[in-house]
Structure formats: structure tokens, C-alpha cells
């Protein structure tokens, strides 16, 4: 190890939203089961829904029912993705604790994803942030394609940092860099994070090329302590060709446990939640820890 690691890390599981979004629709009652399983395992930040058009994203229909149906815990932050002011109004009315918004560092990706320019999306963030501020709710701005675009290749770290500054000026209270395309490497993580004036940034990592876990370790060495992950490693953007799922929550927690970085999350219960995801989507999830368990698990004696 080349640097002291943080004593603690915070994980936001985005599985109920980002993980299930590209799947065939899962019943609201089952999505509620998943959220409750995650908080039961110790997660204290969960992205539970997206308030988007159900015609455009059928898997996210019924977001308000999910938010109102979960077993709310006072010490858990329940977040929802919103694409615009109307989505923010619906999410706040449902009672979410945090709003997440996305703007891409790639102009081409932003056009394909939300049919707006980056400038237009920054303006939307300002509208959402103003509404959220009136309600006393924080807004996390997620910069997608922060480590590269499938249409434009690598994006200069200074450009990514400039967009982050604009989002903060627009009213975002937190910032997350997303490796939407799975193009990040430890080198790119260092370059992009170092370009910021502060390391108070979260990372949302995808495992398209099998580098998500090593990228998380590299980020820890840089002082990053906030991570977005998805139980079971599900997810992936339809606008990023060949994009893999998110870094599996249970795999990151298993690593952090071994490194002595506290999360407050029970990795065994989390592995069980990943198997619940398999039941809900009807296929095997791409997570080694979900199937083999953490490294300390012992085989049955018989």
C-alpha cells in the first residue's frame, strides 16, 4: 500500500434504480423488498427510484409507490433520480431525502441520453436545485462519462472539473463522477480527481472492462470516501455501447472490510440481497461475492 486509506467509506446502493432500470419491469412490491433488504444489511444511502416517464423507462414506473411503501428508517437517506423540474416535484411530493441529477461531460452522450445540450442540462440542474433548496433536500449532481465517452474518447480532466464547478454554481450540494462507459483506469481516476479543487467527490463505477474494484482502491488512496454501487453488479447504460453493470456493492464492501475501512454494512446479508436480485430478474448476477461469499466464509463441514 502506497498511501494511508480512509478510516470510513460511505456507499450509496443504486441497484433499485440504476440496477433494475434496464431490466424487464419488477413489481413494486418486490422493489420494496429489495430496498428493505439493503437497509437491513446496513446500507444507509439507497437510490430507490427514478421519477421519469414510464413510457420511456417502464421498469421505473411506480416510483412514488416504492418510496411510500418502504420501511423508512430515520438514519437512511432515500434518493431518487429526476430528469427535470417535474420529476423533482413528484419525488419531493413522494418524500425522498435526496435528489440525483445527471449531466454528461460528453456533449454527444448528453444529446443521446436526454436530448439536450450540456448547457441546457446545467440549466435544468439549477431549476431542480432551487426547488430542492426550498424543500431542504440536497441535490447530488452526477457527471456521466467523466472518465471517457463512447463517442468522443477521453475528455480532458480540466473540462470535467469545469463542468463540476458549473454544477456547484447551479446549486448542486454534492458531486459524483460516473464511469458510465467503464473506461476508467487507476491512471484516469487520479488524473480526473486531481483536477478538482477538492477531493470531496463520489465515484460511480461500472465494471465494463473488469477495472471497477481496482479503480475504487485507487480512489481510496486519493482520499475519496463516497461510492455508488449496485447490489449484484447490475446496471449499464443503453447509450454506452457494451457498457457493463455497476461495481457490485457486496464486492466493494468485502474489499473494504479486508482493508479495515469501516462501512457499517453486513457483507453476508448483502450477498443474500444479491441473490434476491437474481430471483427478481430471473438470471444470475455478475458478482463473485454473491455466489462464493466473502473470503472468510467457510465451506460446510459435511
Walk through the language-model features, giving the residues of each.
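Catalytic cores and adjacent flexible loops of soluble metabolic enzymes
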Residues: 1-302
